[in-house]
From Swiss-Prot:
Provenance organism: Caenorhabditis elegans
Repeat (WD) residue spans along the chain: 77-117, 127-167, 170-209
Composition bias type Pro residues, residue spans: 437-447
Protein name in the entry: Coronin-like protein cor-1
Basic and acidic residues: compositionally biased ranges: 473-489, 517-533
Gene Ontology biological-process annotations: actin filament organization
Length: 607
């Protein structure tokens, strides 16, 4: 059963214009009557052919907002009206222009745009005898430009040297349009004789030829998916239409459909990454867009966007200038007759805010695949590719797990030799004669004790071990009953005692805090007496040349500047001396802090 609704991810593409407050305005476009777009755009700049003496055109940063001054710098390009401009696909600062003065010139725009009028081109290409109608850059080879003149002759130029690589003749009448295929090996032309021709880029020979549209008005043709040709033109009754043709039989269209009746030439724009085609009529208010694929009828209508102002100039942005965070698929810059640049953004609706890989395959890169010399040698190559959003593509790419093979280190070890090792069962105890004699009891070593109240680590003698039998005969000591504080008694009724009355043996019952403070004082006194003994023991002999009573002097004396320990025992001895000095300082600091705390408490409670 055939599907009623066509399945496509571009079926719901919609257009959302940017507000006029965020667009450029007051641009004076040229008034010449020539079937050209008068505009071209890249991710950095947008160029318009404007009014003025000779053939000037303006180059404006693409992110400029607001009114463009009348004295804004421009490119004073030609002596006669400029007919067409085209940006280089590999350098966003290089632009080519053609004119009625029979010349084609190449310009280099500064990175920050023009700050003064530019009148000196980087390269001037002279060879045509009449006006240069149209130009096209080679999509793969660097610095290769194709121009078509009014004398029905085309030139393939090496822009880097300014030399003509190839002269192509054979068209009996005026050439209206030229367009390269995917890899630049061929290009298609439309001519005033109503024929569509496909030519070889290296030799200039006609590969395929066929009749196009019947109308006498200009028609255009471009390469689309799988080498097919999409052409736009007129019927004998001035009805505009498009047709999809196979290169082997250009005279018989695969699909042909009428659009409307009008006099404006229809310009096709093709996005090779998505397969979308946009048909823009000169002087129209509508933009139609279609999808080209391999499913019949091959060209599927999507929608039409209509505005109130007709378009005077149109530019199609490359995929490198899209906003992939918003799922923007294409962007068209339309200059209206009022001088306002409308920015038309085309989006694919998606619920997810993540980068959509199916909408953004790798697009054409700014790195050329061929040089001009390689192209002239007859080489062809596919264009280089780059991700639309390199950061998002790298973040979403799944890391590849690589298992590194390492050498087996244990395989180099020799196996253990077989020896008769006596084994012993752990269930059998050795005889009493083989039991080791008990070790003599040594004096208990001091163990670190942490004081919960002061947070100080002290060294105390470990209590002697008790026999297991005494543990059973030990009686439990009943807990000490503490005096309960009446919670209903106000603090003002509490009678505070002095320190002397509190310390006396008959001074009455002491609180838990008082008992803890008294015990701490006793402990400090014992530590002081013990430290004095240790200092006397560890103190080095007095030196006649270096003697100091201050702690700093003791450190210097203990360290003996210039003395280098000769063995581990001397190093440990020096460390013990320094530890003794540090402990002395710590005790002095604690005593000073306690004295300050006692004084503050005495002052607060008037002891």
């Amino acid at each position: 059963m055939a599907q009623i609704v066509r399945q496509s991810k571009f079926r719901h593409v919609f257009c959302k214009p940017v507000k006029h407050e965020s667009c450029m305005s007051d641009i004076r476009v040229t008034e010449i009557t020539w079937d050209s777009l008068f505009c071209d755009v890249n991710p950095k700049f947008i160029a318009f052919i404007n009014r003025g003496a000779g053939g000037p055109f303006m180059v404006i940063p693409v992110n400029k907002i607001g009114r463009v001054d009348k004295d804004y710098p421009f490119v004073d390009a030609h002596k006669a009206p400029c007919l067409e401009v085209a940006w280089s696909p590999f350098n966003d600062n290089v632009i080519a222009s053609c004119s009625e003065d029979t010349t084609c010139k190449v310009w280099v725009i500064p990175d920050r745009g023009l700050n003064r009028n530019l009148s000196e081109p980087a390269v001037e290409l002279t060879g045509h005898q009449k006006r240069v109608n149209t130009i096209a850059w080679h999509p793969v080879a660097n610095n290769v430009l194709l121009t078509a003149g009014g004398e029905n002759v085309m030139f393939m130029w090496n822009v880097g040297t300014g030399e003509a690589l190839l002269e192509i003749s054979g068209h009996p009448d005026q050439i209206w349009s030229i367009n390269f295929n995917f890899d630049g090996s061929q290009f298609v032309t439309t001519c005033k004789d109503k024929k569509i021709r496909i030519l070889d880029s290296h030799t200039g020979e006609v590969v395929h030829e066929g009749m196009g549209h019947e109308g006498v008005k200009p028609q255009r043709a471009i390469f689309v998916k799988d080498g097919l040709i999409l052409s736009t033109g007129f019927t004998k009754r001035s009805e505009r239409l498009y047709a999809l043709r196979a290169p082997e039989d250009l005279s018989t269209p695969i699909v042909e459909e009428e659009l409307d009746t009008s006099n404006g030439v229809v310009f096709p724009f093709y996005d090779e990454d998505s397969g979308l085609v946009y048909l823009v009529g000169k002087g129209d208010c509508a933009i139609r867009y279609y999808e080209v694929n391999n499913d019949a009828p091959y060209v599927h209508y999507i929608n039409t966007y209509t505005t109130n102002e007709p378009q005077r100039a149109v530019g199609f942005q490359s995929k490198r200038g899209m906003s992939s965070e918003e799922n923007e698929i294409n962007r068209i810059y339309k200059l209206t007759t009022k001088g306002v640049v409308d920015i038309l953004q085309f989006f694919v609706p998606r619920k997810s805010d993540l980068f959509q890989h199916d909408l953004y395959p790798d697009t054409r890169s700014t790195i050329p695949a061929l040089t001009a010399e390689e192209f002239m040698e007859g080489k062809n190559a596919a264009p280089n590719r780059q991700p639309v959003n390199a950061a998002a593509a790298a973040a979403a790419a799944k890391p590849k797990v690589q298992v590194a093979k390492k050498a087996n280190i244990l395989s180099t070890l020799a196996p253990t030799a077989a020896e008769s090792v006596p084994t012993q069962s752990y269930s059998e105890r050795p005889p009493s004669s083989q039991q080791p004699s008990p070790r003599p009891s040594a004096s208990p070593r001091p163990r670190p004790v942490v004081d919960d109240d002061m947070g100080i680590v002290t060294m105390r003698e470990a209590p002697p071990s008790r026999p297991a039998s005494s543990r059973a005969s030990r009686t439990e000591i009943p807990p000490k009953e503490e005096s309960k504080v009446d919670p209903m008694k106000p603090k003002q009724a509490v009678q505070l005692k002095s320190r002397a009355a509190r310390d006396e043996p008959g001074g009455g019952a002491q609180t838990a805090g008082q008992r803890r403070a008294a015990a701490e004082l006793e402990r400090i006194k014992r530590d002081q007496s013990r430290t004095a003994d240790e200092d006397n023991t560890l103190a080095p002999p007095p030196s006649s040349s270096r003697a100091s009573a201050s702690p700093r002097g003791s450190v210097s004396a203990a360290s003996d500047v210039g003395h280098v320990p000769q063995n581990m025992d001397e190093l440990l001895e020096d460390l013990m001396k320094m530890k003794a000095v540090l402990r002395q300082h710590e005790r002095r600091i604690r005593m000073l802090e306690e004295e300050i705390a006692d004084r503050n408490m005495s002052n607060a409670y008037s002891f």
